Amino acid sequence: MVRRPTVLIFGAGVSEDYGFPLARELLISITDSFENGTKVGFTMTQCGFDREFIRRFGDELYFSNQPSVDAFLEQHSNEADFVRLGKAAIAASLLQEELTPSLLNRTEMRLYEHLWYHVTGPIGTYAGNQLAVITFNYDRSFEHFLRKSFVASHPKFRNQADEFERALSQIEIIHVYGSLGSLDKKSGNYLVYGGRDDPFNPKVILSASERIKLYHEAIGRDNTTARMRERITEAETICFLGFAFYPSNVRLLQFCGLGENKETKHFGSAYGMKLGEHDFIRQELGFDIRLAGEQTKSLDALREFPVLQPVREDIKP
């Protein structure tokens, strides 16, 4: 169990290990599909968007040289049709990726499995978990993984839905920019993982797209930032995983209290980043942070730093 207040902050690099595209990859995938009229591009016409408008959107997205579709949409936030199409394309792309079998690839230990090892226990002990995950990703791969793991590990949960949801809720997952939908069947925002059985149904895609938020929509519109602030300011340890440290995302975290608690220890992966970029990250954050090397991915960074250390009573002789 994770019994000390601990926050993991997920970026796109976490989901990449489970088959989801990085920000730039998603942008290129959407522009290619819009140009060639393949699956996602064709689906946008079924969602009611004009072919010529789709083509123009794709051209502007490609030549914008923005780091992500989200960043592009933020620049076009006053153009409602651009925002609607962009969000729909993101939703259609990620619902398709949710259906890929990469989540079930068990040939090697990966991040989700490692986290499950640290949070699992007897049914009555889950209330002791103090782990929270703040994710900048729209996909629900981590929630889906946890649900599968909970039920497979505890058959009792199959017939006790309320107890299952209570246990699951002890590991709080906060989607900064929204998600494709809730995996809780009792939720009004419920959407089955991958949108099965019809992930390219226009109603499914448009419904999922309405739950996606841009930067300017994430500030103070609901209780998300309040929940983030509570977890961030109370955390003894915060670890960034697969996170690119884009200035806008850092500012949002600072708005939610990042750096206010001077006792919090900060760690992070920095896969593919050079030492000079480490200095830039520290300047952006405004405090010191221990960063793993440029060849170290999320799982190994988490294992390298003292983030999930058990308290003494959890250590077996």
Where are the regions that the model predicts?
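Active-site periphery "cap/insert" segments of enzyme catalytic domains
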Residues: 2-9, 18-20, 38-178, 225-234, ...
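Short N-terminal signal/transit or membrane-insertion segments
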Residues: 11, 101-117, 193-211
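Short, surface-exposed, polar/charged, turn-prone segments marking secondary-structure boundaries
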Residues: 34-38, 160-164, 201-206, 266-268
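Residues at the C-termini of beta-strands that transition into short coil/loop
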Residues: 137, 177-180, 270, 293-295
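Short, conserved catalytic or adaptor-binding loops enriched in Gly and charged residues
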Residues: 162-168, 203-207, 258-260, 282-286
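Active-site cradle of extracellular carbohydrate-active enzymes
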Residues: 166-196
